[in-house]
Every structure is written in C-alpha cells, then in structure tokens.
Amino acid sequence: MDRYAEQLHLTMLAKAPEIILFAYNQLLGVKLSPRFRTPWQGMGTSFNYDEMTAPIRQKDGTSIEPTTMARIADVVLKQTDKLIGKLGNPIGIKSYKPFHVAGDDFLQNYLGMIGLPMDIRPVFPKDQQVVLLTAQAAQAPELMTDIRKQLQSGRDVVITSGLLKAIPEKIAEIVELRCTDLKALVNDFGRYGQAGRDLLIPQVQYYTNDAWEVVSAGRPLTGGVSGYPILLRAPYAAGNLYVLTIPDDMGNLYDFPAKALNEIRRIMSRDMDIYLEAPSKVGLFVYDNKTLVVENFNDEPVEVRIVTDDEVTRLENLENGDILAPLPAEPVQSRRPVTPKN
C-alpha cells in the first residue's frame, strides 16, 4: 500500500499535467486492513498509516470511518498538493533519446534511483555542461558531430558502456576506448568502499595515460591484480568524455558503495549546482526555483548530505520552516578533470 501512495506522490512531484489512478476498481473494492501497515511506520515517513485510517470528521460533527484503499489517494493527493505549489519546474541531467529507438532500456529509471535526476530529451541538448548519452543515441545521424561540438566548447559528455559497445568505430574517431565482450566480477571499489555482492560488468579497455579511471573496481581492487573502470575519463579538445560502466544487471547499480555514487553524482550534476551524498535508493528532485525534494526509497532511515555551490548558505524546510545550517566541506578524493592546453 505504501508503494501505491509513493507512486501518487512521485507523479505529483514530477509535475505531471494529468494523473490517472491505476486500478480504480481496487481502490473501491479492496478494504483497508492492518496488514497494510508496514514495519517502517513510525520512523518519520511522509505517509502515516495511522492518520490515514483515522475517522474523518465532518462539518456537522459526525465522523466517517475510512474503509477502502481510495482513502490512500485522498490523503496523498491532498498532502502533496500543499507542497507542489512551492516547487518550480523540474530540471535534471539531460539525456539524449531520439524518437523510436531502443538500447539501455529503462536505464534512466535506475539512474534516478541512485540520486541522478533525469531529463530525457528527443534532441541533443546544446546548452548543458554535461550531456548523458546511452545506447539509445546510437542511431542518431549527427551524434558524433554533436559530441565533438560539446567537447570542443569545453563541456563534457558521459556515455554508457552500452553506447561504447554499440558504436565503437564512431567513438574511436575521438578517443581510443573499447567495450569488449569480456566480463569481470567486481566487489571492491578501493577507497570508495565495498559492494554488498559480486557485480558482473563489461570490461572497458583503454590506453594508459590516454584515459584515467575516476572510479575503479576489482575483486579485490585493493591488493589485487586487476582493476576495471567504473567511471573513465578521456580528455578531448577542451572537454572530457566519460564512460560510465553499467553492470549486466542494471539493478546492481544499487549495490555501488555510497562514496562511488557520490563521485559519479558530482561529475554528472554540474548543470544543477547541487548533488547528493547518500547511499543508493535515494532520489533527488530539483526545480528551477532553487527548491528540491529528497526521497528515501530504502526501508530504513539513511544519512544524506546535500552538496551545493558556495552561493547557498542555508536550506529551509518548506513544510515546517526549519533552517538547515551548512556543514564543513569535505575534500574531494578523486582527480579533478584537467583541461588540456594546446
């Protein structure tokens, strides 16, 4: 039941112009039951089961006892409606997906669940510091021209290992990188921490000193023999082309250690001037009026840091007015991108 409430909440946060309630027959036909009360109730979650099932007091002094799941939609829509009027238009990391294409299917959904807000566009974005290209962009006729212009202007492109695999000859016009048929089992991300399980990834190969590993993984990486790039940087002209290695099971992105995710978020979020430091399954919604929403999809509380630029001196909770003071900045561990000099 919490998941249904969550879907309504997220749809409103996305500022969808219309909402269709799924399975309306179930809303009317399924009776409320104590078994719907989840273990995480009472942990400060935005959805409160006990308040939802409480009697509804009428103007004439009488009360109505909620009996069906329709009450969920009533509570969530009213609750979120008080907030969304304070939020601007959603913004995110722009990802180029031409019409009528396939490849890296649903990847943006998984990236959103690791704190990378996605904004999918059918035309190559020409006004962004960072553009994400998945295998969906492989068939775009002007793709390499657009990539060159982006890099030559001093801006960055992030491609997935899936796109590198799909168009190796085209990418080779810019950088000498290859996504091979070889696989690697990894679980150790070195200074960025350990994964909770073994992850199967494609092996991305490159020439040493022509490209640099920003995030690496091995089994083990620390004290081991081999390491493999998770996030690889290859300078070109005045910009950088990054390769983000996607596990064979996209759900394994959720198993990346938090510090590795933090570095990926930092590099990909330049256009928003804000990013999360958090474990996976924490979503970030950013809006164009300097507002944001952080959503925890885990079954337990997690610690989250919001990293902003120097212009932001405090954060205000839009629901209760609480002020969050900034914490001391922590040093960035990775090599920062270097702009090549001619």
What are these regions (language model features)?
Residues 1-106, 232, 244-245, 253-254, ...:
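Hydrophobic targeting/anchoring helices
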Residues 108-109, 118, 122, 134-342:
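A conserved amphipathic helix/loop scaffold
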Residues 126-131:
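Short acidic/histidine-rich motifs immediately flanking catalytic phosphotransfer sites
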